[in-house]
A protein has these predicted regions:
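Hydrophobic alpha-helical segments, especially transmembrane helices
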Residues: 7-10, 257
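Bacterial N-terminal signal peptides
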Residues: 9-18
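Glycan-processing catalytic domains of CAZymes
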Residues: 29-374, 380-405
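Bacterial Sec-dependent N-terminal signal peptides
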Residues: 18-34
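N-terminal secretory signal peptides that target proteins for export/translocation
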Residues: 1-5
Length: 405
């Protein structure tokens, strides 16, 4: 009898060990023990953190130095395109030395796909293949063929395609349908789009009224397709017709990336690296470094999390958004000043959080909030403190998070 029981115990212990090993090796889909992300993040993180991407601006010859400077401000992925595979391999080698990843292409990727993918796919610095930026709907069949051809040689690395913002792609209310058509046609591991919301017209700063509608639609399609979102902040001042895109302040960068964050973004991008570093760091370098440190600190909460809902407060609500008609559980009162806030309910690891972003990129926001449950307050660097009902100021574009126990 004792030997029989002992054999059963040994068998059960072995089963438990096998199950545990299988769970441990299940990839990145479980962002932490016991929690399954609503989307697959396998191969879409960098050193256990968010991918933070700088777009273009580094020549192959400069990459040995500039990629190290890029990493210094918290950017861990470089995206660029080159004429030859030799340049691509140089950038990959230098990226590995710098400790970053790369999303790259060259002309031959599409004309000699098998050979080029064969040279790139096993390089440890390769994050993804760069396929296209802002394609038209008529490009979708061609992109489908290009992606499938690459995936036939390498299905371990994603193919990167970035989509138009809603204001630049026909009627704003048709945007969701176009994104859905793209994701239905072209195989994608994540959905990337650009929208640079902060602009100046006649010397007056504002953000595009369609911006939050863009985030709403991307979030809706991404949830339906179970795909993570990649979004942008603008780091390069430039002109477009009568619109000026200014050198971004810290408040403007925070507003863009923290709004992306609370809408569920899992990848964060900057256009372009030239706005951050050009032979020497620009005035934007330290601001980007500050924001990136916050993003990685908050990845413990937001990476792989479910964004249950998003609301807006303020005197007027952005087009396509909804107001806070009922309060999240545990909150009995919530009031904000002036421009208002983006409010997001986040669930991860069985824990519930409410994240609040000041939508004003110029001025502090007053936040008056009350609770009927135990609450932990978390700042933009992940530091925690016990909280009670309070009246606080939130700096321009900044974020504050409350864990509701």
């Amino acid at each position: 009898m004792f030997k029989a029981l002992k054999s059963i115990y040994v068998y059960l212990a072995a089963v438990i060990l096998v199950v545990a090993a299988c769970e441990k090796n299940a990839g990145d889909r479980s962002s932490s023990e016991g929690w399954e992300s609503p989307y697959d993040l396998t191969g879409l993180t960098v050193d256990g953190g968010f991918p933070i991407v700088a777009w273009t601006g580094i020549t192959a010859s400069d990459s040995g130095t500039w990629l190290k400077e890029m990493k210094g401000c918290g950017i861990n992925v470089y995206l660029g395109w080159y004429d030859t595979i030799e340049e691509v391999m140089t950038v990959l080698d230098n990226a590995e030395t710098a400790g970053v990843k790369a999303i790259l292409n060259c002309d031959e990727l599409f004309s000699d796909t098998g050979n080029i993918v064969g040279r790139m796919k096993d390089h440890p610095a390769l994050f993804a293949y760069h396929i296209a930026d802002e394609p038209s709907t008529s490009d979708f069949p061609m992109l489908k063929d290009a992606v499938n051809r690459i995936l036939s040689f390498d299905d371990a690395h994603p193919c990167y395609i970035n989509l138009y913002p809603n204001w630049a792609w026909g009627k704003i209310d048709d945007y969701l349908q176009k994104v859905n058509a793209f994701l239905t046609t072209v195989p994608q591991r994540f959905v990337s789009f650009d929208h640079y919301p902060i602009m100046e017209v006649g010397g007056v700063s504002s953000f595009r009224p369609e911006w939050y509608k863009n985030l709403e639609d991307i979030r809706r399609v991404a949830r339906a397709k179970k795909l993570p979102i990649w979004a942008f902040a603008l780091s390069l001042a430039h002109y477009l017709d009568d619109v000026t895109y200014p050198v971004p302040t810290l408040g403007q960068l925070r507003l863009q990336q923290f709004s992306n964050l609370v809408y569920g973004a899992q990848g964060f991008q900057y256009f372009t690296f030239h706005g951050i570093y050009r032979n020497t760091p620009t005035q934007v370098y330290d601001r980007v470094k500050d924001v990136n440190a916050s993003l990685q600190a908050l990845s413990k909460i937001f990476m792989g999390a479910e964004i249950v809902d998003v609301w807006h407060t303020g005197a007027s609500l952005p087009y396509g958004t909804k107001g806070l008609s009922s309060l999240p559980q545990g909150i009995t009162s919530l009031k904000t000043s002036d421009v208002g806030a983006v409010i997001s309910q986040v669930v991860k690891d069985g824990r519930t959080y409410v994240a609040i972003v000041n939508k004003d990129f110029n001025r502090d926001m007053t936040l008056d909030i009350a609770f009927n449950r135990k609450v932990t307050k978390i700042d933009n660097m992940g530091y925690k403190a016990q909280a009670q009902s309070e009246n606080i100021t939130v700096s321009p574009g900044n974020i504050v998070i409350y864990q509701i126990h």
